[in-house]
């Protein structure tokens, strides 16, 4: 209803101003601005819903102030360009319509009415209301009834008898199991679901809508609200340190807790969360690569589901034979948006919908087959009678190629339980949410029937039943949940540990690099993660007078305030205000002590603008003073005009990447010397080793041969044509995820460059 009202007000404002208001520059600008805001809000809502399926939520608010990088982002470049072009066209058309009768005399009454209607359209729009609610949730003090509903369970289970296998299916929501909507999509796992306790109405709440958030909700009974963006949790040293979670209770009760997944454990801080709450045995892509049958059989995120579940089965056998009480948690990945991945061992490799193949549905059908095979192995084993198997989605599916079909259904998360000790076959339609999962499992294992805000769906009453407005209630509790982190409110002294790459202050520890906004009553950490903008881009969003402490590699801040450190990859500390004074200190000791020192200076807006503009320079446009191209820092020497075919800086240098260009091209601002030596320090990747690598300058070509280890080679060039471009052609770029950012498409690596130097020869 509010959508129709807001659109009607918008339309009325446009028509009244266009036909009655007449000509007045101020009223035209004001009305166009407000109507334009209405358009931007609704496009933001549309785009947000495209990604989240839940409108403008916490994840979107974070993205609006940072940048979205990570898995599958390239899939959305064209839609993003389309939105920008559409927005430009709408603004142009709106301006033309409003100026329709610009030659008529101005009418104050109609102008005021049009502006009020425009303001009303913004106020009535769902997008404005969602953003308003989110902003309020950032500044509330909390809800006084939080303490009444948040309950800590007993720290142990008396006389535990059952082992636990808990399977998180990535985005594997219950909606996929609707056989009428999606015939024969999940036959194997669907049959197992129907044999157990199937909870059919598990809703998704704010703060539970991505993987680490879903894990926290299901194991701790609280949403993941933090004083920083949730996926940046890899930077913290402990995770809700004061809370009692399911893993803590299991460990205290004599369980050995295991977690197995195909992706890197550091992503989104899963390793920190699990280690903080009772898990001593963790296996991710790094830990599995030395034990799996084929370490090269991987997708963009890590190992495929068939590999991961095979390792989980081996671990289940080993632990069951030992007689030790255990829990085994595993997380799949093949159903990750936007398209998913197909394991090579499954029979269900293709699923057609609407008369054509659908990659996301195909990935679901394949993954559920692998999960079902794993469960059936357990059921066929002699240890099943002592085992409880739980299958749940970590969250609802995000925007994938099946998403528009899912949205036509009543969407719920998956949660079902198969008991080996006491088979039960029942579908329970009780209203519940992800936070109830841990309490329900705890109840089955013989513990309490509550865990944080979660309640057992077998013997308790879910918050989803108690509160009809549970989503709004959850947001109202957000400040209370953030306070559970016990995060410090001041920062006066800090310590940097170079061996551990950590910073400590006021009892808290964070991994480096780190940016902090420091005020009188609050310290806001802004870590760097796969889904966040680089810290310098985040700093560029600070207000002129915001106090900051920025700990990062020296070269990243050198172009602003310490040019002498432009080639240093050591740690540096910068602090101050973007519109005031800044200092840069080189961290020159293994354990380095620092103090915050913010001076109350006059703000210089010209200085502020200059700092912001410099911070926003993209890596490839950065230039530094040097007589050679140093590849382990961002940018290039001042003599270089542009370059291509080169990947991002790493600690040792940079790889060539054929995804960015078949050749490495370095174009200089001026012609290269008539005679020069080209000194190349580099290595080769894979099959490029010991192969001739053409190196060209103008019409002259030399051959470079590299091994897998770094070596230095000098090539002699004559340049009679005054060529200004150096070209290196790796013979056989190899597609690989080695050293890649988690979730990104594979790079095609050829040579790894450490340094390239042009040395002019006499004569």
From Swiss-Prot:
Sorted UniProt keywords: Cell inner membrane, Cell membrane, Membrane, Transferase, Transmembrane, Transmembrane helix
Segments passing through the bilayer: 1-21, 26-46, 77-97, 108-128
Pathway: Glycan metabolism; osmoregulated periplasmic glucan (OPG) biosynthesis
An annotated GO BP: glucan biosynthetic process
CDD domains cross-referenced by the UniProt entry: LTA_synthase (cd16015)
Subcellular location: Cell inner membrane
A Gene Ontology term for the protein's cellular component: plasma membrane
EC number assigned by the record: 2.7.8.20
Protein name per UniProt: Phosphoglycerol transferase I
Annotated source species: Shigella boydii serotype 18 (strain CDC 3083-94 / BS512)
Lineage, broadest ranks: Bacteria, Pseudomonadati, Pseudomonadota, Gammaproteobacteria, Enterobacterales
